[in-house]
Swiss-Prot record:
Keywords: Cell outer membrane, Membrane, Signal, Transmembrane, Transmembrane beta strand. Residues 1-23 form the signal peptide. PANTHER family: BLL7405 PROTEIN (PTHR34001:SF3). It comes from the Bacteria. Disulfide bonds: none annotated. InterPro entries: OMP-like, OMP/PagP_b-brl, OMP_b-brl. Belongs to the Omp25/RopB family. The keyword Transmembrane applies. It holds the Pfam family OMP_b-brl. It is found in: Cell outer membrane. This is 25 kDa outer-membrane immunogenic protein. GO terms for cellular component: cell outer membrane.
Amino acid sequence: MRTLKSLVIVSAALLPFSATAFAADAIQEQPPVPAPVEVAPQYSWAGGYTGLYLGYGWNKAKTSTVGSIKPDDWKAGAFAGWNFQKDQIVYGVEGDAGYSWAKKSKDGLEVKQGFEGSLRARVGYDLNPVMPYLTAGIAGSQIKLNNGLDGESKFRVGWTAGAGLEAKLTDNILGRVEYRYTQYSNKNYDLAGTTVRNKLDTQDIRVGIGYKF
């Protein structure tokens, strides 16, 4: 009887410690609460933008009197456009206007380029934070021929096409590099009674910086 009484007393004394240990185990066995996952905001190319460009042009002017002349030089200007976006496809319209310092003479005939501009469609693929794209449209440029006796300047219209890569530098600042090929139609120039037929092709590499609204 005394043994049974002793067991009851010992069990009663250990009961609080057992309950505490069980409660501690229950608390420890609860699964940890997963930390919230932060989702980065999706960048959109949609909207308007504008910027400046600097480039270099490799030109080839074919003439009916002295053959080919290659007036290569720097160019600079501004561009602006508007993008639309559906999933990863980016499309829109862009225009640019600038000035080319290309000028060269051969056998007394000088070819000089001046104002140039274009209006183009553009389509790209969003690889956030960069976008490769293709572009094509119409182009125009002021081109002057001079043979030392007479000079004539004409505004020429042609077509242009190219490809580029645009990158998001910040939420609003864009950087780009672009290649363009442009061909201007044949034109006749009347230089002191001599008719000179001219065709001009240009190849440009341009780098630009822009601001997205």
